[in-house]
């Protein structure tokens, strides 16, 4: 166990003793302050269990304290987060908050109008969310469209190239479900061992645990999906038989086998937490068919109104009826105004509509009226679930504010921190398991922290650093500050590595990564010379002025010296040494240019070089001698030759 872990445990122990010695209670804010940022849900559960065993009540912060947010503190936080200096406000403006256009003030004002939830309220809302989910699953399982999707997903899951497990289910929810079912089998020894795990690799362990969970539960999910696919096959066969035996589709409400299979399907699907994309895939298909059906019925209603049929009369005869040839014959005998004329003059249109409605019934496996009732039930359950989630979220927005304020001045504006925290809060609502016996804020705190810290890691830095590396950087920085207070001097990487039980190379690497980038436009000095940091950085690719002058002078001198030779000799030397050209040439290449042998070119080159070695010519080039390679286009190559 590291010193950091011991420090965290000591904080919890001291908080527990303090609560026992006083009034036997502690607030959630006290626990949140004692827990480090990287605390996992399981560790929070263990801490809450310790307080529960010690019979210490865990209370919300004072409602007045939760609602009351000091104007000065909020103004300061807003200045910090937006980097905007506000002018002092008049007293009348401070008193009249209702007319302010400050988005933070308006947000806090609306947020303060929602009452805090008790434990009983949270359980009641969680049950509403759970009931809405159950209703949705039961409705989906009655649809042959969903049955076809279940079968397809099973086939894709077996073929790993088509679908991964994480694309089908919500791994986190399934992992939490497995933890809940196996929670009773855990003992205190295993809990103690888990508390002693090193937190240096929290994020990496989470990634590994997710992959490990995916591998572990894959056989179970495949087996369950196989069973679901088999049940769906049985239900679809019975539905098909119903079509064959009767002239049209019908609901098998009186079939015991059908109802038993349906109940079994609902039970199996309830055990699998499909991710939102898969559920949306089924719902979007059903809603598309429902919209198409509504458009057809609306067009039929408008046509009926043209023949003098009132809206109420149309609904009385249409709603609840099976629209087929028998209905058409029945309505021809209807003595109410307009019906006989409509069915006679628009006979082709009516026949086409009956055929289209029949196609929808075959596609959905349900009568049109039953399909519409099913869609209405699904939409109602969705509305109830969304309203319950909304109630839970709005009542816990104060928690987001209290956590977001701790992360000010880390690269994101205050409103952005609130927004990211709210996203984490919404995830917490989806994952909340009220049966574990703890308050919602326990789980929400972890999810909000995670959302905010990840947003800071992803968005605050100019150069993005992975989240797990950000966590390691923060851990090293905290340890470095702690050791500075203990030792009185900046700790070395070796001392930090020893304290964290981490390889020294990794500490050096992390400390190097932690350096912030600096803008080249940063002003340098306090004067008015407008100097910037970029002006003092050497350009390795730029030519120094002295070198440029030497090269220019060398070219001029070389040109004058070569001009003292014959044109042929000058041309041969330029081609052989690449002077004024992109590259040098071989004897064979020069010979081809002059249409002579390579031996003749060698003789001309030797004669020209002997002329250049004459003191009258050579003394002009001696001052330019360099160690450059032959053929790099440098005229001083002539002297080396």
Swiss-Prot record:
What residue range is the signal peptide? Answer: none
Q: Which domain of life is it from?
A: Bacteria
Q: Which InterPro entries match?
A: RNA_pol_sigma-70_dom (IPR014284), RNA_pol_sigma70 (IPR000943), RNA_pol_sigma70_r1_2 (IPR009042), RNA_pol_sigma70_r2 (IPR007627), RNA_pol_sigma70_r3 (IPR007624), RNA_pol_sigma70_r4 (IPR007630), RNA_pol_sigma_70_non-ess (IPR007631), RNA_pol_sigma_70_r1_1 (IPR007127)
Compartments annotated for it: namely: Cytoplasm
**Biological process GO annotation list?**
DNA-templated transcription initiation
Annotated region described as Disordered, given as residue ranges = 178-209, 615-641
Bias class Acidic residues marks the residues at 180-197
Q: Which residues bind DNA?
A: 587-606
Location of the region described as Sigma-70 factor domain-2 in the Swiss-Prot/TrEMBL record:
392-462
For this record, the Gene Ontology CC terms, alphabetical, are:
cytoplasm
A molecular function GO annotation: sigma factor activity
Keyword field contains Electron transport? no
Give the record's keywords alphabetically: Cytoplasm, DNA-binding, Sigma factor, Transcription, Transcription regulation
Q: Where is this motif: Interaction with polymerase core subunit RpoC?
A: 416-419
Pfam families linked: Sigma70_ner, Sigma70_r1_1, Sigma70_r1_2, Sigma70_r2, Sigma70_r3, Sigma70_r4
Q: Where is this region: Sigma-70 factor domain-3?
A: 471-548
Annotated region described as Sigma-70 factor domain-4, given as residue ranges = 561-614
Q: Keyword Signal, does the record have it?
A: no
HAMAP family for the chain: Sigma70_RpoD_SigA (MF_00963)
Which family is annotated?
Answer: Belongs to the sigma-70 factor family. RpoD/SigA subfamily.
Q: How does it assemble?
A: Interacts transiently with the RNA polymerase catalytic core.
> Tell me, what does this protein do in biology?
Sigma factors are initiation factors that promote the attachment of RNA polymerase to specific initiation sites and are then released. This sigma factor is the primary sigma factor during exponential growth.
Q: What is this protein called?
A: RNA polymerase sigma factor RpoD
Protein species of origin: Rickettsia bellii (strain RML369-C)
């Amino acid at each position: 166990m590291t010193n950091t872990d011991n420090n965290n445990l000591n904080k919890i122990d001291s908080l527990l003793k303090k609560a026992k010695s006083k009034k036997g209670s502690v607030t959630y804010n006290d626990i949140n302050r004692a827990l480090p940022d990287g605390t996992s849900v399981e560790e929070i559960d263990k801490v809450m269990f310790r307080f529960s065993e010690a019979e210490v009540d865990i209370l919300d912060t004072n409602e007045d304290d939760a609602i009351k947010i000091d104007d000065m503190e909020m103004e300061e936080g807003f200045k910090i987060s937006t980097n905007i200096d506000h002018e002092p406000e008049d007293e009348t403006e401070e008193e009249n908050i209702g007319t302010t256009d400050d988005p933070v003030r308006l947000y806090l004002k609306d947020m303060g109008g929602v009452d805090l939830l008790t434990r009983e309220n949270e359980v009641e809302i969680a049950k509403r969310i759970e009931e809405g989910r159950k209703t949705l699953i039961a409705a989906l399982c009655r649809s042959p469209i969903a049955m076809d999707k279940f079968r397809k997903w099973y086939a894709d899951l077996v073929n790993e190239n088509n679908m991964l497990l994480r694309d089908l289910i919500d791994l986190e929810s399934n992992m939490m479900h497995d933890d809940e079912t196996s929670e009773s089998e855990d003992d205190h020894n295993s809990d103690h061992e888990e508390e002693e795990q090193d937190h240096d690799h929290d994020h990496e362990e989470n990634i590994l645990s997710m992959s490990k969970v995916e591998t572990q539960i894959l056989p179970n999910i495949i087996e369950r999906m196989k069973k679901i696919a088999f049940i769906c096959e049985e239900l679809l066969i019975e539905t098909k038989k119903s079509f064959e035996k009767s002239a049209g589709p019908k609901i098998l409400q009186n079939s015991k086998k059908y109802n038993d299979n349906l109940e079994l399907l609902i039970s199996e699907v309830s055990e699998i937490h499909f991710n939102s994309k898969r559920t949306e895939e089924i719902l979007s298909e059903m809603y598309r068919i429902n919209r198409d059906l509504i458009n057809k019925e609306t067009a039929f209603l408008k046509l009926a109104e043209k023949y003098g049929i009132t809206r109420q009369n149309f609904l009385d005869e249409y709603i609840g009826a099976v629209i087929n040839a028998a209905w058409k014959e029945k309505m021809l005998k209807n003595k109410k105004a307009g019906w006989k004329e409509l069915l006679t003059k628009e006979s082709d249109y009516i026949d086409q509509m009956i055929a289209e409605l029949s196609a929808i019934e075959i596609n959905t496996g349900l009568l049109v009226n039953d399909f519409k009732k099913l869609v209405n039930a699904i939409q109602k359950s969705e509305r109830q679930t969304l309203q319950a989630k909304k109630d839970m979220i709005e009542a816990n927005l104060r928690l987001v504010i209290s956590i977001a304020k701790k992360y000010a001045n880390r690269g994101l504006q205050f409103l952005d921190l609130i927004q990211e925290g709210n996203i984490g809060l919404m995830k917490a609502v989806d994952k909340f398991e009220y049966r574990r016996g703890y308050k919602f804020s326990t789980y929400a705190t972890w999810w909000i922290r995670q959302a905010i810290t990840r947003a800071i890691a992803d968005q605050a830095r100019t150069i993005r650093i992975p989240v797990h590396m950000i966590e390691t950087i923060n851990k090293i920085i905290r340890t470095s500050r702690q050791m500075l207070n203990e030792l009185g001097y900046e700790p070395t990487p070796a001392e930090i590595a020893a304290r964290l039980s981490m390889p020294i190379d990794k500490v050096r690497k992390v400390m190097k990564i932690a350096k912030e980038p600096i803008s080249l436009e940063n002003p340098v000095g306090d004067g008015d010379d407008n100097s910037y940091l970029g002006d003092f950085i050497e350009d390795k690719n730029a030519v120094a002025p002295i070198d440029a002058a030497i090269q220019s002078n060398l070219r001029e001198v070389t040109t004058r010296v070569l001009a003292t030779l014959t044109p042929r000799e000058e041309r041969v030397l330029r081609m052989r040494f690449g002077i004024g050209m992109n590259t040098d040439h071989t004897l064979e290449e020069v010979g081809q240019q002059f249409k002579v042998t390579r031996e003749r070119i060698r003789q001309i080159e030797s004669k020209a070089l002997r002329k250049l070695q004459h003191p009258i010519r050579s003394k002009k080039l001696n001052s330019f001698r360099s160690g450059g390679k032959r053929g790099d286009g440098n005229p001083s190559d002539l002297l080396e030759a």
